Regions:
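Bacterial N-terminal signal peptides
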Residues: 9-19
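Extracytosolic ligand-binding ectodomains
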Residues: 2-4, 10, 26-418
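Sec/Tat signal peptide C-region and signal peptidase I cleavage site
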Residues: 20-26
Length: 418
């Protein structure tokens, strides 16, 4: 080991003396363990999630934090489970960043707390952290910072849209997945808070070959609207089965329905038969961040996997990873204690407003305080690592997702705090 280190040092010195850039040693990398899906109920998201992560890291690596390029290790959780995948990334791959603790975090929380306490790593930014209880995160002992509001907020937004659409009652259903359950419970609570009639709320199995019995059960209740929280495949199947049964419903789905698997499963003809098929998801801000982001994403080699860069997951990946990288530069080291404080510093306060990674990294290196506002809008965090968001209503039109409305974010936050 000593001989290898001396040889490496000599090679670097020789390269410098000859005027060449010194090669980056593997130990200088920042390794990002990406908890993603390649198999299972959400397996269709895999190429998209991986492509988005690679696209964002390519932007950051044009001028990486602390001069240390960031490299992703994409780890499927669909088959082995989130807990086992997380342990593999931390113990075997030695990642410094664990990206996307999510639905099953509580099953390995003790392991992560012990690891962070012992090593001061990994950092835990999470696009899917909205499925984690809102009292968890935002501390050096548990450095979870979310890229989106809590999942419950999307459930609240979906129900508010039903009311704004002029409907008088609703049936609310969800698959037995943690995030879907949280959204359903929030929608039911919202209905109670605003005095909206819920004709029924019930759970369904994920991954069924068809949902004809569910369609029949809903039909007997004769609702004016149906709200469903599920995977793209399950949602698409229900939409198609309902159309096959001759139903024409006002359907509001969850953000997962942004994946093309939903559109392909539901089919264009079935969607057209319904009164409406829309979904509630986070939308982008109208600020200087958006167009440069779109231009970069569309020009990247991963655009074929990403599809529409305005997808809420894509913009959340972008802002979260950019903010995380800026915080690493601000901290001056890779450690949960300094990074946690830096996450608050670079996303809030009275610092110089910046709208891109380039602006932020340059300002930090000039010794300035910054306040990063990204594609999703303000990135200011609560003391448990929760970020706010903008809420849009979307529908599939000729194979492409289009925003057709919005939901009052202040009203969502008001109901969420009750």
């Amino acid at each position: 080991m000593k001989r290898s280190s001396v040889a490496s040092a000599g090679a670097i010195a020789l390269a410098a003396s000859l005027g060449f850039a010194a090669p980056v040693a593997a130990e200088d990398e920042i390794v990002v363990g990406h908890l993603t899906y390649h198999t299972g109920e959400f397996g269709a998201f895999g190429p998209f999630f991986d492509g988005v992560a690679e696209m964002v890291l390519s932007k950051i690596n044009e001028d990486p934090p602390l001069g240390r390029p960031m490299r992703a290790v994409h780890q499927d959780i669909g088959t082995v489970g989130e807990a086992r995948a997380a342990r593999k990334l931390v113990d075997s791959d030695g990642v410094q960043i664990l990206l996307n603790p999510a639905h099953s975090y509580l099953s390995y929380r003790e392991f992560m707390l012990e690891t962070v306490a012992d090593k001061g790593l990994p950092l835990m930014p999470s696009v899917h952290g909205g499925a984690i209880e809102g009292t968890i995160g935002g501390t050096s002992a548990e450095p979870i910072f979310r890229g989106s509001p809590l999942d419950t907020a999307n459930g609240t937004a979906a129900l508010l849209h039903v009311q704004e659409a002029g409907k008088k009652n609703v049936v609310i259903i969800a698959t037995e997945v943690a995030g879907s359950q949280l959204q359903k419970e929030a929608a039911v609570r919202t209905a109670e808070a605003i005095g909206f009639e819920v004709l029924g709320d019930f759970d369904i199995q994920a991954g069924e070959s068809n949902y004809r019995s569910v369609v029949a059960r809903i039909s007997r209740l004769n609702p004016e609207a149906v709200v469903m929280f599920s995977s793209p495949q399950a949602g698409g199947s229900l939409v198609k089965n309902a159309a096959e049964a001759g139903e024409s419903w006002y359907i509001v789905g969850s953000g997962e329905w942004q994946e093309t698997e939903f559109y392909d499963t539901a089919t264009e003809s079935a969607i057209a038969q319904h009164e409406a098929v829309v979904l509630a998801a986070n939308s982008h801000a109208d600020n200087p961040s958006f167009q440069p982001y779109m231009d970069f994403a569309n020009a990247s080699k991963w655009i074929g996997d990403i599809g529409d860069p305005a997808n809420s997951y894509a913009i959340q990946y972008y802002d979260l990873l950019v903010a995380s990288a800026l915080a690493i530069e601000k901290a001056g080291e890779l450690n949960t204690a300094s990074w946690t404080q830096a996450m608050y510093d670079v996303t809030g306060g009275e610092g110089e407003k910046v709208y891109s990674y380039e602006e932020g990294i340059a300002a930090i290196r000039d010794g300035k305080d910054i306040n990063y506002d990204g594609v999703t809008g303000t990135m200011e965090y609560t003391d448990t690592g929760i970020v706010s968001g903008l809420f849009g209503i979307f529908e599939w039109q000729d194979g492409a997702l289009a925003q057709v409305g919005s939901v009052d974010g202040d009203k969502v936050l008001e109901l969420e705090s009750m």
